[in-house]
């Protein structure tokens, strides 16, 4: 079957500069890398084609030969005696790019770092504002306490891989050229476990639940994450452990709402207090405090109590408490109260008293003008 054009494989033009080729290779290598497509033979074949195309097109001599002779340039005898020499070693062809993407393309493959874990923690507003220490229990993978992460039975050691001789890489011939690939026998580790540990069966890790004490700093809010370094899953065969991320979710409070570092609450007052003014008690997270309400206070007026909000988890000034006044209409009036209110209303000059209810007057004046305009 005819081989696909190297330029088409990478999706670049025949005049593409090296940086364009490198960029295309990085993108495709990430997409088709075997670690991301385990068990996918089609992706594995595609990845090999991408590597082969990159090897040729980023080498000026190889690229010139390919542009002139095509794939025949790299077949045995394809260029007569004028090739690059059968003994050429291009083992470092992927060093700079492939290593940047996957953490080192040459040499033995590092054991995989442990996976990061996430734990969702629900807090009350009081806990979030003041800070709290909580114990949590999480399922995880921990280092095997029998083999101490090696995967080998106690008294034995992992043996050097006979295929790659411990390098983790094997050399594959392609025409005149040699490329290095991950050893299929040891998967790049350079060692094999002949006598696996009876407890972890050679994995070096076991499933276990552990209890942790998590200190939540004061001022956290929904969406904040707390990182516990090294408290994730244990790494493979002694590799570093991952991290644990505690995701904060603050429960809804029956009185307060939080916006940033400020707290908001609604304070109901009766219409007499709103009209005459006075002193009321309002709740804060530190207890009750007195608030002076001036006369003629309207519904919706905000009163700011400085420093009664939330202390920022990132430092800086403490937030405020903003109390929104809601003037309540009285219900369940007795006859005497109704009579007094009737007298009060008459003293205002009726339901739309102009002097004592300026907003009411403004509204009804607007309504009158609206209908007058309609009848003209």
From Swiss-Prot:
GO biological process: chaperone cofactor-dependent protein refolding; DNA replication; protein refolding; response to heat
Alphabetized UniProt keyword annotations: Chaperone, Cytoplasm, DNA replication, Metal-binding, Repeat, Stress response, Zinc, Zinc-finger
Gene Ontology CC: cytoplasm
Binding, Zn(2+) 1: 144, 147, 197, 200
Cofactor(s) in the UniProt record: Zn(2+)
Zn finger region (CR-type): 131-209
Annotated PROSITE patterns: DNAJ_1, DNAJ_2, ZF_CR
Pfam families named in the record: DnaJ (PF00226), DnaJ_C (PF01556), DnaJ_CXXCXGXG (PF00684)
Oligomeric form and interacting partners: Homodimer.
Family named by the database record: Belongs to the DnaJ family.
PANTHER family membership: CHAPERONE PROTEIN DNAJ, DNAJ HOMOLOG 1, MITOCHONDRIAL-RELATED
Protein name listed in UniProt: Chaperone protein DnaJ
Lineage: Bacteria, Pseudomonadati, Pseudomonadota, Gammaproteobacteria, Enterobacterales
